[in-house]
């Protein structure tokens, strides 16, 4: 369906010119040109300054100043104390430098005075003045002393070898051996030089050790006939004969006293070693516990029969059928013999 056309009425704005104010642009009279209305806003727009983009960026970049924070009273006092200390230290520095300079000047002055005093004093003269001839004599004396000490050192090994050679040639009797060793000790003391005192102790210790070893070897190599003779002698006689030569060695006063004193102790050991087999033969054989105690009366009758070891009756916490090892397997074999 087609709409009917509207009826439009023309409106005259001239009627409203006198009644209203001309301030509003909406109610402009129709007689005014259209161009003026368009030009007026352009002029207004040109009057307004265009803001530069650079200025805007700078304003944005500049940081806004933060508001000042209020500082506490303790912090203020601390900062003021620091400022005062810095000011005082700056004032004290020049005074310290002046004091250091003065101390250095004083030390240099003292050193200069000491040098002048030392140069003014005459050189000290020693009490012992030696002439050129005396110096030559002193050199000769020192050379002779060195030569004598070298000779003493050469003699010391030969003197230490002498007791080694005499030790194997000792006889079977301990008394004769001790007598010869005491004589050799006295002879060595008379032949030794005063320079031998320095290396005396080491050579004597070495000689004593060698003599002990040689004596042990000779005791082991002696025949059975001598052993029987030693068994017949009692221990008291052997100790008496071995102790006798000790006072002779002490009276001699020779430098080889440790050798003479150490020999009697070795001689006392010899008869004890030789008599040990006889002591072993006298020891009673092991008797089983069954033969001792209340059965002493029947021990003589059962002496010929071999006794059983006590381990057979012991159970030791095991069952009766479990085999038990004997505690003393060698006991029965020794009794049978």
From Swiss-Prot:
Covalent cross-link (Glycyl lysine isopeptide (Lys-Gly) (interchain with G-Cter in ubiquitin), residues: 251
Record's keyword terms, sorted: Chromosome, DNA damage, DNA recombination, DNA repair, DNA-binding, Isopeptide bond, Meiosis, Nucleus, Phosphoprotein, RNA-binding, Telomere, Ubl conjugation
UniProt crosslink position (Glycyl lysine isopeptide (Lys-Gly) (interchain with G-Cter in SUMO): 251
Biased composition annotated in UniProt, kind: Acidic residues: 190-205
GO CC, one annotated term: chromosome
Motif (WVPP motif): 286-289
Modified residues (Phosphoserine): 19, 23, 103, 107, 309
Motif placement: SIM motif: 138-143
Gene Ontology terms, MF aspect: D-loop DNA binding; DNA binding; DNA secondary structure binding; double-stranded DNA binding; RNA binding; single-stranded DNA binding
The record's account of how the chain is modified after translation: Sumoylation with SUMO2/3 by NSMCE2/MMS21 promotes stabilization, possibly by preventing ubiquitination.
Composition bias type Low complexity, residue spans: 290-304
Region (Disordered): 1-69, 88-337
Stretches for region Interaction with DNA: 32-50, 225-286
Tissue specificity of this protein: Most abundantly expressed in testis. Also expressed in spleen, thymus and bone marrow. Not detected in heart, kidney or liver.
Keyword Transcription: no
Compositional bias annotation for Basic and acidic residues: 44-69, 105-118
Subcellular compartments: Chromosome; Nucleus; Chromosome, Telomere
Functional description taken from the UniProt entry: Structure-specific DNA-binding protein involved in DNA repair by promoting RAD51-mediated homologous recombination. Acts by stimulating D-Loop formation by RAD51: specifically enhances joint molecule formation through its structure-specific DNA interaction and its interaction with RAD51. Binds single-stranded DNA (ssDNA), double-stranded DNA (dsDNA) and secondary DNA structures, such as D-loop structures: has a strong preference for branched-DNA structures that are obligatory intermediates during joint molecule formation.
Oligomer status and interactors: Monomer; elongated monodisperse monomer. Interacts (via C-terminal region) with RAD51; the interaction is direct. Interacts (via SIM motif) with WDR48/UAF1; WDR48/UAF1 and RAD51AP1 cooperate together to stimulate RAD51-mediated homologous recombination (HR). Interacts (via WVPP motif) with DMC1; the interaction is direct. Interacts with PALB2. Interacts with RAD52.
Protein name, as recorded: RAD51-associated protein 1
The species this protein was found in: Mus musculus (Mouse)
């Amino acid at each position: 369906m087609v709409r009917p056309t509207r009826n439009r009425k023309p409106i005259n704005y001239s009627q409203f010119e006198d009644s209203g104010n001309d301030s509003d642009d909406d109610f402009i009279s129709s007689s005014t040109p259209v161009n003026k209305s368009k030009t007026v806003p352009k002029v207004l727009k040109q009057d307004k300054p265009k803001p530069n983009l650079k200025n805007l960026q700078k304003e944005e970049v500049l940081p806004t100043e933060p508001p000042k924070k209020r500082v506490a009273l303790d912090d203020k006092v601390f900062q003021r104390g620091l400022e005062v200390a810095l000011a005082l230290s700056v004032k004290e520095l020049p005074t310290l430098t002046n004091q250091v300079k003065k101390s250095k000047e004083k030390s240099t002055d003292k050193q200069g005075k000491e040098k002048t005093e030392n140069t003014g004093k005459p050189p000290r003269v020693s009490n012992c003045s030696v002439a050129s001839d005396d110096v030559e004599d002193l050199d000769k004396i020192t050379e002779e002393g060195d030569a004598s000490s070298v000779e003493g050192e050469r003699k010391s090994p030969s003197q230490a070898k002498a007791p080694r050679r005499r030790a194997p040639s000792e006889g079977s009797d301990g008394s004769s051996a001790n007598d010869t060793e005491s004589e050799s000790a006295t002879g060595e003391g008379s032949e030794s030089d005063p320079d031998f005192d320095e290396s005396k102790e080491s050579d004597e210790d070495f000689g004593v050790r060698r003599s002990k070893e040689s004596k042990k070897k000779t005791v082991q190599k002696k025949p059975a006939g001598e052993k029987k003779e030693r068994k017949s002698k009692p221990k008291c006689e052997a100790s008496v004969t071995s102790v006798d030569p000790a006072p002779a060695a002490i009276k001699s006063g020779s430098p080889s006293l440790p050798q003479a004193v150490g020999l009697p102790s070795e001689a006392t050991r010899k008869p004890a070693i030789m008599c040990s087999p006889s002591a072993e033969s006298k020891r009673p054989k092991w008797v089983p516990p069954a033969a001792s105690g209340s059965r002493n009366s029947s021990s003589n009758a059962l002496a010929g029969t071999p006794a059983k070891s006590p381990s057979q009756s012991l159970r030791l916490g095991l069952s009766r059928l479990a085999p038990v090892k004997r505690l003393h397997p060698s006991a029965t074999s020794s009794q049978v013999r």
